[in-house]
């Protein structure tokens, strides 16, 4: 355990988010504010617990643009989890939104939030998560809800789907959603 702890490297997500913002600048081709960040973009946390880390991130990257946060609660009915989310804004006036979080496993929080944000007059929706796993890809992948999803290669599993081939039987086919961008930091 000691050897493992001695070799742990803590990675600050500011480098990742700076790369995401640069990618968005190129894609959006919008007017830029101070530090060359897009001015038509809102940085958002997916829940109240993520807002404090988001504010620390904003300080590190010198973000002076708009920020927002959602809050959520879980209701347990019939053994299933129902997510209830609230957003302080009800009209984003066409601004694009970048949701920043640390991990996406199944994507339920982000799917629910994306549905709500679409009803709040937002522009494009983007998601940046440091760690992403393949569990969120099944029949209803989180990438279906966003214009673009960003993740690092820290916990990126190859996306595969099963298909039947007449000559070879069941095959695993490597597939990556077109709107998923992996930023290599490791």
Locate predicted features.
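PRPP-associated nucleotide enzymes
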Residues: 1-186
């Amino acid at each position: 355990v000691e050897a493992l702890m001695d070799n742990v490297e803590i990675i600050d997500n500011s480098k990742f988010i700076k790369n995401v913002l640069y990618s968005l600048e190129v894609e959006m081709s919008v007017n830029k504010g101070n530090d060359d960040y897009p001015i038509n973009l809102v940085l958002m946390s997916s829940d109240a617990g993520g807002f404090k880390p988001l504010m620390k991130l904003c300080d590190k990257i010198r973000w002076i643009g708009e920020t927002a946060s959602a809050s959520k609660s879980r209701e347990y009915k019939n053994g299933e989890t129902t997510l209830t989310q609230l957003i302080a804004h009800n009209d984003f006036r066409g601004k694009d939104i970048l949701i920043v979080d640390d991990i996406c496993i199944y994507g339920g929080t982000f799917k629910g939030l994306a549905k709500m944000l679409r009803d709040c007059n937002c522009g494009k929706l983007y998601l940046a998560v440091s760690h992403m796993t393949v569990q969120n890809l099944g029949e209803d992948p989180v990438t279906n809800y966003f214009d673009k999803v960003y993740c690092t290669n820290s916990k990126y599993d190859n996306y595969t789907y099963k298909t039947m081939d007449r000559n070879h039987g069941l095959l695993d086919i490597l597939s990556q959603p077109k709107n998923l961008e992996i930023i290599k930091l490791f």
